[in-house]
Design a protein with these regions (language model features):
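Membrane-cytosol interface at the C-terminal ends of specific transmembrane alpha-helices
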Residues: 176-199, 250
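Transmembrane helix-bundle core of multi-pass membrane transporters
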Residues: 63-186, 243
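Transmembrane alpha-helical segments in multi-pass inner-membrane proteins
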Residues: 28, 36-38, 220-233, 237-286
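Pore- or pathway-lining transmembrane helices of multi-pass membrane proteins that form conduits
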Residues: 48-69, 80-81, 174, 245-260, ...
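Alpha-helical transmembrane segments within multi-pass membrane transporters and channels
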Residues: 21-61, 276, 281
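Membrane-interface helix caps of multi-pass small-molecule transporters
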Residues: 14, 19, 36-47, 70, ...
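Hydrophobic alpha-helical transmembrane segments
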Residues: 3, 7, 24-32, 54-57, ...
Length: 286
């Protein structure tokens, strides 16, 4: 993951700075390259049946070296690419403006936190009601209310702390988009259930008539796409591209997944759980 992040970021920096390419075209190329890298690795894993550890280890070493080649061992600054930097949350003023005034507390951020807490509470109650209606096992109302109170309090406290600073950072918008999109995909789509099924028991899934090779291929291609997005955010926040970016991202990603409830054997875990794991990893590394 880290090497692909570095490689895609290096390509983007060279295109925008050295070649003076249009920003939107450079972004498109970065997404395409990341997706193709994921597809390349997915092909060897899904169809040639080379162990994933071998393929990803080779990719980690290869793309780290290619990043060094692309950047020629130097740092490429993208400070002048202000639109790109601001779009991906790298500038000092990359925060959502306060639409309710310019006081010491960003009221827009507080309002957004209240809305998020209310939406979370409604979704939790609706989810429980749906389970009860369909006859599924559901947590009792007391535990549901307790969960809502605790998480809503965390959301409100977090939003208030942001409001005391500068408000909502624009990079947080990208994080929320990824959470919502992939939370929906994994929970409410057929493809998402296929991912869980293949992770839980590949043989049983294949005997059920599901093309497991295609599922593996799509999973790795998707990860290449996300690595490209991470590469853009990384170089935007650092306002430069360096051959050393992305080091140890692999361990951060693995640790975040396991802390967040995912299993090494597959088939379990949720997107919100992984986000919690990532937050804890970030706190540990401070």
């Amino acid at each position: 993951v880290g090497s692909v992040v570095c490689f895609v970021g290096a390509i983007g920096a060279v295109l925008m700075v050295n070649m003076k390419m249009n920003m939107w075209l450079a972004i498109l190329i970065m997404f395409v390259i990341g997706t193709l890298i994921g597809a390349f690795q997915g092909f060897w894993i899904a169809y040639v049946r080379i162990p994933p550890f071998i393929v990803t280890l080779a990719g980690m070493l290869a793309f780290r070296g290619l990043s060094n080649v692309v950047l020629q061992g130097m740092t490429v600054s993208i400070k002048d690419c202000t639109t790109f930097v601001n779009l991906f949350g790298g500038g000092a003023d990359c925060y959502i403006p306060d639409f309710f005034g310019n006081g010491p507390i960003n009221l827009t951020c507080v309002f957004a936190g209240v809305i998020a807490a209310v939406i979370f509470a409604v979704l939790q109650l609706k989810n429980r009601a749906d389970k009860v209606k369909k006859g599924y096992e559901a947590p009792n109302m007391g535990s549901t209310i307790g969960k809502i109170v605790v998480i809503a309090a965390v959301i409100l406290a977090f939003s208030y702390r942001l409001a005391q600073h500068k408000g909502i950072p624009s990079v947080l918008i990208w994080v929320l988009i990824v959470i919502m999109v992939y939370g929906y995909i994994t929970s409410n789509t057929t493809v998402g259930r296929y991912f869980y099924a293949v992770g839980g028991n590949e043989k049983a899934t294949k005997l059920s008539g599901i093309n497991t090779n295609k599922v593996y291929f799509l999973a790795y291609m998707n990860m290449g796409f996300l690595a490209a997005l991470a590469g853009m955010v990384t170089i935007a926040r650092m306002t430069s591209a360096q051959p050393t970016y992305g080091q140890n991202y692999e361990m951060d990603a693995i640790g975040s997944c396991f802390i967040g409830g995912a299993s090494a054997y597959g088939g379990t875990g949720t997107v919100p759980g992984v986000i919690v794991g990532a937050v804890l990893m970030g706190v540990i590394k401070i």
